[in-house]
């Protein structure tokens, strides 16, 4: 059984930890609001750019000289997975959730006989994935020293991916990140970057439903410039979603830690009081017994 001094020290230690977790929760809450606003502001732009890209792609055929970033290499053998996670921990299962999602994708591709390469963005993703797939990680990018994610950070990553594609290092590139839904809900998401996804175009307003678009100088030239920028925009959105998700997960984790610390303090205080009461009772019995002996 721990002594009164040990219990007192443990109570003081847990109280100090509780102060830290409470402060971290408040900091995460303050950062969450800004991060959430940034992520929500980026969504319409990235979604609309995808729709514009799909519209232009409909007007281009291979014979028109469509960019290889849209048409692909014609093969589906080498896959590059760009896995975006946080730079720091203490955010519950946020990082492990994304890494697990990417790991499942790796296993599926390997089972199909594909060659997999991994590009990690964020220290935690690298730390998790290197335990099992160190030989597959060919590139890593850390943003630990970046105070606020900017488009230039995403653009650097996008240009590096395009350079790797131009060098023939992969055929398909897929982006993995966590889409922010709420403080307690972040959804692991996979988005194909290369070849550029030109899926269904978003529904247009009735006034524009039958619109005919003309492109200058020509659709292929526009795509040549637009697709690289779209890749950077989608990466930028993913990074912003990740920051919002990380702050939400961190706030939730620190709130749980603060409440758990409070419960532990109550239990330790109860043990301290019981032991102190037992010690006082014992001393009183000894005093009374000594008085009776006299």
From Swiss-Prot:
One of its GO terms (cellular component) is proton-transporting ATP synthase complex. It is a peripheral membrane protein. One of its GO terms (biological process) is proton motive force-driven plasma membrane ATP synthesis. Keywords: ATP synthesis, Cell inner membrane, Cell membrane, CF(1), Hydrogen ion transport, Ion transport, Membrane, Transport. Gene3D superfamilies: 3.40.1380.10, ATP synthase, gamma subunit, helix hairpin domain (1.10.287.80). PROSITE patterns: ATPASE_GAMMA. HAMAP family: ATP_synth_gamma_bact. F-type ATPases have 2 components, CF(1) - the catalytic core - and CF(0) - the membrane proton channel. CF(1) has five subunits: alpha(3), beta(3), gamma(1), delta(1), epsilon(1). CF(0) has three main subunits: a, b and c. This is ATP synthase gamma chain.
């Amino acid at each position: 059984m721990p002594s009164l001094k040990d219990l007192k020290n443990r109570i003081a230690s847990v109280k100090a930890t509780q102060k830290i977790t409470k402060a971290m929760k408040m900091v995460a809450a303050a950062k969450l609001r800004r991060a959430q606003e940034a992520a929500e502001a980026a969504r319409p732009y990235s979604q609309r750019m995808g729709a514009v890209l799909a519209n232009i792609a409909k007007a281009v055929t291979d014979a028109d000289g469509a960019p290889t970033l849209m048409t692909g290499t014609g093969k589906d053998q080498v896959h590059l997975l760009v896995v975006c996670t946080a730079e720091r921990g203490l955010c519950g299962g946020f990082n492990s959730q994304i890494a697990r999602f990417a790991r499942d994708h790796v296993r599926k591709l390997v089972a199909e006989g594909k060659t997999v390469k991994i590009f990690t963005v964020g220290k935690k993703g690298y730390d998790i994935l290197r335990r099992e797939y160190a030989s597959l990680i060919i590139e890593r990018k850390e943003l630990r020293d970046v105070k606020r994610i900017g488009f230039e950070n995403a653009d650097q990553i996008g240009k590096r991916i395009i350079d790797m594609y131009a060098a023939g290092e992969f055929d398909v590139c897929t982006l993995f990140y966590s889409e922010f839904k709420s403080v307690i809900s972040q959804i692991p998401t996979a988005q194909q970057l290369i070849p550029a996804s030109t899926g269904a175009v978003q529904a247009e307003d009735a006034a524009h439903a039958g619109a005919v678009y003309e492109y200058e100088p020509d659709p292929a030239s526009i795509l040549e410039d637009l697709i690289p920028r779209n890749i950077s925009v989608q990466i930028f959105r993913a990074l912003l979603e990740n920051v919002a998700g990380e702050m939400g997960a961190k706030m939730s984790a620190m709130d749980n830690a603060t409440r758990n610390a409070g419960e532990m303090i109550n239990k330790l205080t109860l043990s301290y009081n019981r032991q102190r009461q037992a010690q006082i009772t014992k001393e009183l019995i000894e005093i009374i017994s000594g008085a009776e002996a006299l």
